[in-house]
Amino acid sequence: MADQRPLMTWLEANNYESFLQEDIFSFLDQSLFVDPHSSFIDPFKDFQTQNWFSLQDSIVNHISTTFAADHTFLASLDLEAISSTFSLDISSGWWNENNGNYNNQVEPNLDEISRTNTMGDPNMEQILHEDVNTMKEKTSQKRIIMKRRYREDGVINNMSREMMKQYFYMPITKAAKELNIGVTLLKKRCRELGIPRWPHRKLTSLNALIANLKDLLGNTKGRTPKSKLRNALELLEMEKKMIEEVPDLEFGDKTKRLRQACFKAKYKRRRLFSSSS
């Protein structure tokens, strides 16, 4: 025991009191006791002697007997299966090395998460359903608009001035509807063809004047010569044809006066009818 004193002094000098209190190395009291007359005084002198290996066996056997409980615990487990499949985590969970997941769980994708979050919530399901319907409606509307624009562009590009003449006697909105195009595109095509304004009002006014003169021509009793009325009718018919060819043409002075005279005649006729009744 006198040989163990330097060892105890060295351990105390290095502050190993906590380990000595636990008495973990108590098994070294017997295993390191060596006879001074034996060959262990110089172990490196005969490194492969029986005494050296017997000393190793005694230390290892003593350690194995001391920690027998640990070996028993490890032996009860299938180490090969654990190393190949699972490893124990610090937080008492299992990590699967094959699929790289914790506790052998399969992580859901984003679609499954979104469906799981919306399950049981009728408001969220209704909102998602409305959003999908809105997206479909917008997509269908865009397709309809693109098809209509493509068709309208084809119709407008093929439209000439001669084709538009037959639509001059109707309002521009009705003409666009008849042509199955938009009013804006029709106005644009008119400007491209040199028609700054739609001549519907001018032609309608001329048709009204012609109708009034025909009535006067049938009801005259010698106060107005019929020859003058016929000349006026010819003048209006000529001007109507000129406006069809040149829609931007303004009325002449004779046409303006004739229009004022017709207005006065209609006014007098109304006064007579109202007074007689």
UniProtKB/Swiss-Prot annotation:
GO MF annotations in UniProt: DNA binding; DNA-binding transcription factor activity
Source species of the chain: Arabidopsis thaliana
Name assigned to this protein: Protein RKD3
Coiled coil: 201-246
Residue ranges of every copy of the RWP-RK domain listed in the record: 142-226
PANTHER family, per database record: PROTEIN RKD3 (PTHR46373:SF32), PROTEIN RKD4 (PTHR46373)
Keyword ATP-binding: no
Localization of this protein: Nucleus
